[in-house]
């Protein structure tokens, strides 16, 4: 409707393909995540390395369209020299190393907490990949301030996840549905 075509690249993990996406996207590509112990034997965050797939970069190289990297976990190819001349937009979901540190503090189980602590350290070291983005979009003003300090030479904009909250624009009444935004299997979202 807006004259924009979307090519969506997504990773399969704990859920099936979504045919609904094909009705709003020009193309939808699915990739399998590399999960398990082997995918964890790296200096990169597990949640980044597990999304490494040569077919993804091959598909990205088929055109010269802008690329939106949704979350730091999706940035494996952000610094790939073959994408040097592409418009790259990084939309952060949260400050990942802070998120994983909080998971480690609130989690149950020694191995699980150790994983979260290691992943926090990996993400803190890895966040420098955002310097390869032409634009960084922050989801909160606090995150925008943090990112401006970390990347003073980058263009950083604040675009909130939700509608403005100083007025209600929803129609009064009840509905059969309610929207929860968050992964409920994560301890912080329970």
Segments (PLM) and residue ranges:
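Helix-loop-beta element that forms the nucleotide-linked donor phosphate-binding surface
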Residues: 82-85, 128-163
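Short N-terminal targeting/anchoring amphipathic segment
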Residues: 58-76, 87-89
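Conserved catalytic-core segment of nucleotide-activated headgroup transferases in glycan assembly
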Residues: 158-190
């Amino acid at each position: 409707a807006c004259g924009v075509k979307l090519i969506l690249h997504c990773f399969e993990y704990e859920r099936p393909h979504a045919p609904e996406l094909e009705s709003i996207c020009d193309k939808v590509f699915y990739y399998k995540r590399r999960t398990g112990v082997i995918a964890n034997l790296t200096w990169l965050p597990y949640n980044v390395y597990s999304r490494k797939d040569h077919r993804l970069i091959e598909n990205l190289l088929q055109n010269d369209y802008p690329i939106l990297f949704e979350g730091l976990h999706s940035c494996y190819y952000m610094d790939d020299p073959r994408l040097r001349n592409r418009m790259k937009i990084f939309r952060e979901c949260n400050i990942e190393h802070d998120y994983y540190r909080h998971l480690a503090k609130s989690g149950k189980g020694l191995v699980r907490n150790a994983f979260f602590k290691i992943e926090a350290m990996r993400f803190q070291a890895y966040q420098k990949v955002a310097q390869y983005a032409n634009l960084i979009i922050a989801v909160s003003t606090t995150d925008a301030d943090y990112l401006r300090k970390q990347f003073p030479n980058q263009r950083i904009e604040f675009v909130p996840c939700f509608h403005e909250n100083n007025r209600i624009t929803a129609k009064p009444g009840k509905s059969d549905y309610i929207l929860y935004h968050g992964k409920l299997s994560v301890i912080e979202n329970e």
